[in-house]
């Protein structure tokens, strides 16, 4: 179908005639719009000069259309009331759903598709058309005129939907499943139809294969510019596996069984579809569509296997090569890494697989964790979902990236840019040159994506490091506070100890224990370790900020974008030349742009890899710091426990000493200030009678504390003398003091003595 200007306004009730959508096999197709409901339909009407045979075909098309119901076959609609009266003849009108996306030919003719559709668009197209053909064949219908003009596009909820139209040449199979008449489009015609031989559904296989090849490469597979007679005599010489018969710039005809370059398919799909095209483009009808695994007509099942592949795309940042792997639903990441090692030589332990956001692929999840559905993006995205492979054994990355090899025709004009080419040769070569510049730009963007993924991963590690730094600082502050408290406390204790020595109370063991504690806490704190780590982290932070500020740390446009746009403009001007100006010419301007693009690519790659090496160095520093910070935090936590333990031990020793002293005082005073007097304190033997039992009851396990307590008992006599002097001086004021702390019952006294023990 081809698009035409608007027609003179004509109405039928609420329906208004709009533009002509195109011309089909028997007549015109016109868009009508309902001004009340907003509904749109396509009305196909026959030309008046149809022969009786074609009038019968037209009626057959309407019958076929009205009984078909499939999402990839355009649906028939009811002809609005009264519209049949507007028909130019007595033949019935055919009303169909309107697909606003236009036909596939219009889509293929867009400049961007000169070297084939994007991968996602190809997969979507193959899926839809295969489904439609299956349906038609199951309903015993051969289309016979499958071509881009007879496929229209409709925007669905998630993607573009392709629908087959124009069944004007469709033929219902008779009981023998053979047909002998045909009038169709020669360029997509199966050989047996050209030869007017009997045929089956395999004629649609040939047309489908030709259509698929054109969508993949941007041109038809077999000498597209040759006349039918010469075409037939030359192409029939191809082998059963040849899928390309082309003419080079020297006029030499070449046969090939390989998919031509360039195209937009990944390596796995290119290989699988190459095998599938060999099935579809077999010259002999009986062998066409026969799959080795699924047998006759097994080409659709073979295509299903291809369309259902789950592919992981790995960009090796060491070489710049993309490796594509079909993976099973439950395949482990370790299994994928083993396959990567076989292709790249990078050990599994050294492989780091990053997604674009810098996230590491999780080892406990399957290899499919990074796959999205490429058939839902309508083929509009320029990039596949990439996983970036880094070699952790490398501390720096060398620039090992070179531009991809050029197609043969492009290499030819690079060597001879002044060589004159025909218009059709120039159109193909210039399109390939433009595509080569596009490819350079996309390859550069992918490498930069990999560098940014490494940068994002560095920032994630740096974020973890910053959190650990904050935790280290918090732990250091807490430890310092406890150390300061402990040191201050022990200094006070030592000062008070020196003051009380005037009363004659001394303990070398107690003093030695306190001195040992004081020395022990001096080993705690880790202030120097913390300081060194903080300095290293601050230096790393400065390096990371410098990386982020670098222009290459962000997505850049630049020279390649400009050169690609200039090449596109040159190609557009060539394509839009009037027919009378389509003369021979050279390719100097396009070659100049390609050479500049190659130089710009190599320069950008050097900058990207310089940035990547700096990123890798920073990441290595961050990874080295992480365990060191963890270790210092662990040691500080141990130091904190040590300080707390020493503090508790010192306090227990003080309280043990105090309890023993108090027990010697409480015994003679019997807990009553009224009965306390000097005479009660004048019997050293009585005062010394209780501590021995307390000492005997001390646990054997705490030997050091027992020794200190024993020494304290030895000092009791000195303490009694001091207490007697104090009691004598304040005997008169005892009754005014608060002695409630001595009001204890015998059970409490026993409990305290047991606690002391």
Swiss-Prot record:
Tell me where in this chain the PTM S-nitrosocysteine is found: 179
Q: At which positions is ATP bound?
A: 21-29, 44
Q: Where is this region: Disordered?
A: 682-703
Q: Which residues carry this modification: Phosphoserine?
A: 177, 181, 670, 672, 675, 682, 689, 692, 697, 705, 733, 740
What does the UniProt entry say about where the protein is found? Cytoplasm; Nucleus; Membrane raft
Q: Where are the transmembrane segments?
A: none
A single Gene Ontology biological process assigned to it is: integrin-mediated signaling pathway
Q: Provide a GO CC annotation, any one.
A: nucleus
What does the record give as the reaction this protein catalyses? L-seryl-[I-kappa-B protein] + ATP = O-phospho-L-seryl-[I-kappa-B protein] + ADP + H(+); L-seryl-[protein] + ATP = O-phospho-L-seryl-[protein] + ADP + H(+); L-threonyl-[protein] + ATP = O-phospho-L-threonyl-[protein] + ADP + H(+)
A GO molecular function term, named singly, is:
protein serine kinase activity
PROSITE patterns membership: PROTEIN_KINASE_DOM, PROTEIN_KINASE_ST
Region Leucine-zipper: which residues?
458-479
- Which residue ranges does the record assign to the Protein kinase domain? 15-300
Q: What is known of its domains?
A: The kinase domain is located in the N-terminal region. The leucine zipper is important to allow homo- and hetero-dimerization. At the C-terminal region is located the region responsible for the interaction with NEMO/IKBKG.
> How would you summarize the oligomeric state and partners of this protein?
Component of the I-kappa-B-kinase (IKK) core complex consisting of CHUK, IKBKB and IKBKG; probably four alpha/CHUK-beta/IKBKB dimers are associated with four gamma/IKBKG subunits. The IKK core complex seems to associate with regulatory or adapter proteins to form a IKK-signalosome holo-complex. The IKK complex associates with TERF2IP/RAP1, leading to promote IKK-mediated phosphorylation of RELA/p65. Part of a complex composed of NCOA2, NCOA3, CHUK/IKKA, IKBKB, IKBKG and CREBBP. Part of a 70-90 kDa complex at least consisting of CHUK/IKKA, IKBKB, NFKBIA, RELA, ELP1 and MAP3K14.
What does the UniProt record say this protein does? Answer: Serine kinase that plays an essential role in the NF-kappa-B signaling pathway which is activated by multiple stimuli such as inflammatory cytokines, bacterial or viral products, DNA damages or other cellular stresses. Acts as a part of the canonical IKK complex in the conventional pathway of NF-kappa-B activation. Phosphorylates inhibitors of NF-kappa-B on 2 critical serine residues. These modifications allow polyubiquitination of the inhibitors and subsequent degradation by the proteasome.
Q: What is this protein called?
A: Inhibitor of nuclear factor kappa-B kinase subunit beta
Taxonomic lineage is:
Eukaryota, Metazoa, Chordata, Craniata, Vertebrata
């Amino acid at each position: 179908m081809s698009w035409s200007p608007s027609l003179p306004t004509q109405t039928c009730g609420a329906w208004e005639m709009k533009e002509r959508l195109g011309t089909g096999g028997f007549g015109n197709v016109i868009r009508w719009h309902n001004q009340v409901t907003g509904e749109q339909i396509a009305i196909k009407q026959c030309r008046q000069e149809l022969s009786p045979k074609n009038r019968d075909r037209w009626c057959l098309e309407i019958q076929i259309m009205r009984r078909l119901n499939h999402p990839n076959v355009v649906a028939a609609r009811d002809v609005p009331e009264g519209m049949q009266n507007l028909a130019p003849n007595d033949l019935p009108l055919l009303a169909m759903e309107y697909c606003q996306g236009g036909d596939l030919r219009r889509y293929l003719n867009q400049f961007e598709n000169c070297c084939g559709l994007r991968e996602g668009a190809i997969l979507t197209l193959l899926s839809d058309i295969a489904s439609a053909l299956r349906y038609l064949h199951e309903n015993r219908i051969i289309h016979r005129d499958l071509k881009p003009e007879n496929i229209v596009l409709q925007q669905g909820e998630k993607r573009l939907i392709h629908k087959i139209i124009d069944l004007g040449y469709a033929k219902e199979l008779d009981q023998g499943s053979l047909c002998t008449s045909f009038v169709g489009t020669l360029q997509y015609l199966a050989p047996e139809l050209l030869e007017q031989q009997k045929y089956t559904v395999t004629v649609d296989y040939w047309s489908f294969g030709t259509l698929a090849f054109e969508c993949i490469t941007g041109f038809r597979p077999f000498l597209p510019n040759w006349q039918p007679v010469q075409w037939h005599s030359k192409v029939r010489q191809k082998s059963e596996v040849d899928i390309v018969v082309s003419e080079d710039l020297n006029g030499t005809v070449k046969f090939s069984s390989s998919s031509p370059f360039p195209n937009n398919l990944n390596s796995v799909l290119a290989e699988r579809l190459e095998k599938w095209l060999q099935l579809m483009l077999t010259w002999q009808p009986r062998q066409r569509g026969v799959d080795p695994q699924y047998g006759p007509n097994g080409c659709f099942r073979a295509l299903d296997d291809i369309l259902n592949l789950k592919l992981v795309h790995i960009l090796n940042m060491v070489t710049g090569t993309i490796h594509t792997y079909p993976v099973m639903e439950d395949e482990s990441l370790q299994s994928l890494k083993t396959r990567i090692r076989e292709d790249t030589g990078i050990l599994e332990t050294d492989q780091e697989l990053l997604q674009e956001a810098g996230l590491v692929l999780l080892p406990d999840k399957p290899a499919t964790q990074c796959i999205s559905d490429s058939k839902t993006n309508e083929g509009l995205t320029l990039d596949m979902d990439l996983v970036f492979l880094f070699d952790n054994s490398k501390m720096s990355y060398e620039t090992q990236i070179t531009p991809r090899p050029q197609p043969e025709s492009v290499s030819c004009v690079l060597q001879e840019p002044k060589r004159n080419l025909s218009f059709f040769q120039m159109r193909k070569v210039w399109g390939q040159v433009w595509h080569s510049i596009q490819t350079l730009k996309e390859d550069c963007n992918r490498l930069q994506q990999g560098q940014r993924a490494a940068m994002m991963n560095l920032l994630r590690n740096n974020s973890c490091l910053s959190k650990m730094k904050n935790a280290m600082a918090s732990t250091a502050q807490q430890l310092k506070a406890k150390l300061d408290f402990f040191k201050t406390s022990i200094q006070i204790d030592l000062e008070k100890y020196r003051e009380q020595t005037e009363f004659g109370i001394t303990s070398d063991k107690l003093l030695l224990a306190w001195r040992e504690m004081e020395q022990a806490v001096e080993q705690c704190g880790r202030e120097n370790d913390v300081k060194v780590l903080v300095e290293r982290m601050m230096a790393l932070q400065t390096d990371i900020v410098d990386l982020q500020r670098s222009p290459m740390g962000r997505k850049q446009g630049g020279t390649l974008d400009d050169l690609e746009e200039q090449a596109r403009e040159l190609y557009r001007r060539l394509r839009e030349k009037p027919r009378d100006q389509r003369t021979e010419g050279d390719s100097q301007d396009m070659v100049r742009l390609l050479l500049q693009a190659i130089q710009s690519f190599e320069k950008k790659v050097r900058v990207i890899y310089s940035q990547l090496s700096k990123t890798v160095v920073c990441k290595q520093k961050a990874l080295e710091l992480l365990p060191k910070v963890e270790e210092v935090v662990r040691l500080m936590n141990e130091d904190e426990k040590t300080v707390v333990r020493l503090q508790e031990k010192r306090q227990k020793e003080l309280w043990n000493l105090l309890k023993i002293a108090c027990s010697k005082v409480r015994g003679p005073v019997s807990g009553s200030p009224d009965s306390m007097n000097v005479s009660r304190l004048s019997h050293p033997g009585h005062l010394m009678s209780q501590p021995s039992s307390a000492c005997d009851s001390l646990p054997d396990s705490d030997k050091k504390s027992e020794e200190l307590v024993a020494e304290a008992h030895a000092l009791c006599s000195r303490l009694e003398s001091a207490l007697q002097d104090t009691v004598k001086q304040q005997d008169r004021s005892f009754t005014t003091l608060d002695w409630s702390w001595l009001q204890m019952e015998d059970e409490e006294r026993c409990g305290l003595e047991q606690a002391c023990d």
